[in-house]
Amino acid sequence: MLKRLESLLAQADMALTSAQKEKLLGYVALLHKWNKAYNLTSVRSPEQMLVRHIMDSIVVNPHLRGDRFIDVGTGPGLPGIPLAIVRPDAHFTLLDSLGKRICFLRQVQHELGLDNITAVQSRVESFAPPAGFDGVISRAFASLGDMLTWCAALPRKEEGRFYALKGQLSEEELNALPAGFRVESVIGLQVPCLEGERHIVVLAAN
């Protein structure tokens, strides 16, 4: 698995430390183990997890600005856990409403020694952080409009940004934003060995 991960990283022109690679593989091992009982992801094989969960998450890293992020609807920690591993100087709040997912995330935190994540069990509409985040990240929402509607109160005023991880994008979706928001950029992502389009949409309040 290490050689496979190193091959994928080389294709993406990404350099990680041995400790970071070890933690990414440790996360995949835990996800594979827990998935058998808790059904955390539809991806069953560790090899596919490397592509569809690890690489699909960490290719986002160069486009993030700031050091305080929240991953909304994180599920089993995606993209938050892989990002926290490759961005150790930043802090990630992982928000999800299901207890079994939060239990898994806390086990991951304990076993991998990740001190830059906080797992929070809450619905997004009930979550009131003490301060706004530099970035609100999610790949859980069906539409950009839904993400902005539910997460409007989470970013820092003016400097905060929304980072939506999407597959195919339509002009219709980009043009159907709630009032008061704008698209700053749409960035195509290259994920090694993953077919289909991947984008990160960066949004901000007007």
From Swiss-Prot:
Enzyme class at the top of the EC tree: transferase
Name of the protein described by the UniProt record: Ribosomal RNA small subunit methyltransferase G
Reaction equation(s) it catalyzes: guanosine(527) in 16S rRNA + S-adenosyl-L-methionine = N(7)-methylguanosine(527) in 16S rRNA + S-adenosyl-L-homocysteine
Bilayer-crossing regions: none
UniProt function note: Specifically methylates the N7 position of guanine in position 527 of 16S rRNA.
InterPro entries: rRNA_ssu_MeTfrase_G, SAM-dependent_MTases_sf
GO cellular component, one term: cytosol
Binding site for S-adenosyl-L-methionine: G73, L78, V124, E125, R139
Keywords: Cytoplasm, Methyltransferase, rRNA processing, S-adenosyl-L-methionine, Transferase
Molecular function as annotated in GO: rRNA (guanine-N7-)-methyltransferase activity
Keyword Nucleus: no
One Pfam assignment: GidB
Coiled-coil ranges per UniProt: none
EC number in record: 2.1.1.170
SUPFAM superfamilies, alphabetized: S-adenosyl-L-methionine-dependent methyltransferases (SSF53335)
